[in-house]
Amino acid sequence: MSTYGTLLKVTSYGESHGKAIGCVIDGFLSNIEINFDLIQKQLDRRRPNQSKLTSNRNEKDKLVILSGFDENKTLGTPITFLIYNEDIKKEDYNSFINIPRPGHGDYTYFMKYHVKNKSGSSRFSGRETATRVAAGACIEQWLYKSYNCSIVSYVHSVGNIKIPEQVSKELENKNPPSRDLVDSYGTVRYNEKEKIFMDCFNRIYDMNASMLKTDEYNKNTLTIPSIDNTYINVKTNECNINQVDNNHNNYINDKDNTFNNSEKSDEWIYLQTRCPHPYTAVQICSYILKLKNKGDSVGGIATCIIQNPPIGIGEPIFDKLEAELAKMILSIPAVKGIEFGSGFNGTYMFGSMHNDIFIPVENMSTKKESDLLYDDKGECKNMSYHSTIQNNEDQILNSTKGFMPPKNDKNFNNIDDYNVTFNNNEEKLLITKTNNCGGILAGISTGNNIVFRSAIKPVSSIQIEKETSDFYGNMCNLKVQGRHDSCILPRLPPIIEASSSMVIGDLILRQISKYGDKKLPTLFRNM
């Protein structure tokens, strides 16, 4: 089916090489102010032809609003978004219309609908995900304004290249990065002439992602785009974390969420990995470019963190929160698996280790500037923002410094800044000291961050010739033509973020329809 949701329904329509694609949101609340620029920003993060790492199909993905708004406020009527397909090349698929492509849906599509697809993957194409990004980017604005709930996804690994385990725990358990930080730290500059990479801290690497020392490469021979270097120690190339906190907003405050457009040089190409670990981002770029030259593809893992979800959403038994999220995330092309919290690693733990102990939230807010964080053992503690940085500074790799979001980052919640809602005078709002459950117990949200990881298979369209059978049983050689990604991971985070917001939004309305808004407490409320 092309519709998701019970009360908040999203229907997508259109084909990859048709005239347009789009979506209809039905059941959305009225009088919600929507920033269309934020929707377009998410579409831009997903669109193809962002860099040499992605498909060169040149789609602008400009949002067209057809209905549901009076200026920028919702009417409560169906919202209709449209996105025109501008770079259509159906002829790329003419040569193999009678050959089901390995790894694609051509064969199963034909067996179900008795139609041979003449224009790529049609409804099964990743092109469809642009519609859910538009819908989700609209819904998530309501989630943030009403519940202070925000969602961030990022690339954890590509192939066997992954964020170091210690840093991964830091991001999942302590301080989830903002989207701007993901895009900033995930940006890598590539000099095709010199065959070198440069990360966001101006560290230079060769084509194998090996860092070059200053005496091995003379930076003075390069025209380096100027970024705010006030927090970079030139001698050690290390980062002053406190200064990063102060300068972060200026650092990412530009059109592309990376570096200032006016400072870009023709010598440099900007590659976006959406991996919030600079060194790993460079490794990913090197790996994908090599695979692209070989005509092959690769998959990986994407992490998603739903911050401050309302407590009590999820419908046991068959509409559990993780079941609904899994249904939605697995509907994204190329996603083949999902795990929550400790996931499969939890199978190696004892129950005494895995059980998440409850504590009153009020016990976590005894200091004026204390933050709700998790220590190295995964236990929730009251920790000063900067003291946490100091305690971990010697333990974290140099390339991971600066991960703490600034105190004024809207995605970083201070527990003392919000009103905690209690059910009544006797029952207290609780939180778990650890989060092995991933923010979900018995299919219902606990209020802790919901953490899950998605397994992404390699893109099926590759430029390597393979022997396969046509529809008539004749063996033949096939080399897929067209414009395709070698790795879909850099474009995936906004899709996962949008898909998650659709699920959370629908479950909130289902809960409200039964018990009213007063039964939806959150750990952190907007003032």
Swiss-Prot record:
- Any single Pfam family the record assigns to this protein: Chorismate_synt
GO:BP terms for this protein? amino acid biosynthetic process; aromatic amino acid family biosynthetic process; chorismate biosynthetic process
A cellular component term from Gene Ontology for this protein is:
cytosol
Please list the residues that make up the active site.
H17, H104, D485
Q: Name one molecular function that GO assigns to this entry.
A: FMN binding
Keyword annotations: Amino-acid biosynthesis, Aromatic amino acid biosynthesis, Cytoplasm, Lyase, Oxidoreductase
Subcellular location field: Cytoplasm, Cytosol
**Quick one: which pathway?**
Metabolic intermediate biosynthesis; chorismate biosynthesis; chorismate from D-erythrose 4-phosphate and phosphoenolpyruvate: step 7/7
PANTHER family, alphabetically?
Answer: CHORISMATE SYNTHASE (PTHR21085:SF0)
Spell out the HAMAP family in the cross-references: Chorismate_synth
Q: Function of this protein? A: Bifunctional chorismate synthase and flavin reductase. Catalyzes the conversion of 5-enolpyruvylshikimate 3-phosphate (EPSP) to form chorismate. Acts also as a flavin reductase (FR) able to generate reduced flavin mononucleotide in the presence of NADPH.
Q: What is the protein named?
A: Chorismate synthase
| Provenance organism | Plasmodium falciparum (isolate 3D7)
